[in-house]
Amino acid sequence: MFVRVLVSNVVWLALVAAAPVAPDLAEAFGARESVEQISLSPDGSKIAYIAPRPGQGAALYTVNLADGQPVMAASVDGDPERLTRCDWLSNNRLACRIFAVVASIEIMPVTRWVALDADGKNSKMLSQSEQLNQRYATGYGGNIVDLLPGRDGSILMDRWFVPEAALKTRLADEREGYGVVRIDSRTLAATVVEAPVRFGVEFLSDGQGEIRIMGTQLPSSAAGYSGSKVKYSYRAKGSKRWEPFSEYDVLSDEGMNPYAIDPALNAAYVLQKLNGRIALYRVSLDGSLRKELVFAHPQ
């Protein structure tokens, strides 16, 4: 009898131990993604991914797929810097975007791009440094317009040019507006590719170093607030002259909104409404602006 009871108790304990534990829904709801962003090197031999760290922190890890061992190349604690994305510039160099909210005189969002090797060494600030003689501050650190495949670490980045105050000098840079520069991520040597446009808001490259589309957004009033319409211009292949392309309303989604350029087809891919829904079109950049539907979903 004693043996039978003992065996029954052991079996009952085993069943209790094997019973599934209900998940902590609150913990699962608040959990961060184990991989927040990932990218593959141009030759396919390495990956880079951003993973969370304790608190608000995050780290960039690179992995050589030959051995599969992750290496921490960079990290931030999240107070206030946030690591938002990293892209390969070459087979051994990356550019990472850092976002922060800085509270000084007022609360201001700030972005900066930093280039570094896959092992975290040789870091360089790609975003333009602010100078004391600039007429105003900007938190915009630019964005990558073209990774320039095959250029071994050089890229095209957009930049907001801030004019300098001519304090006891005649060498102040008075350029202002939205332009594009080519930057060597190792030496930081920079060349202006597109001169700043006062009301420029967007540039699209063909992926081979040629800027083919530009967007401008005029203010809606004397107060300087941006209007809702973006006017897009394009360049024919081999030309530097801007031609009208489309007008897009950011509030109503009316008009053609260009997203990418196919250099082989000499065409732009745009989103535009079709029967009240967004559809994908291909528009020729040969001067005809011939448009053909690529994809539309009935629902």
Predicted regions and their residues:
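Bacterial N-terminal signal peptides
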Residues: 5-16
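Beta-propeller folds
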Residues: 19-299
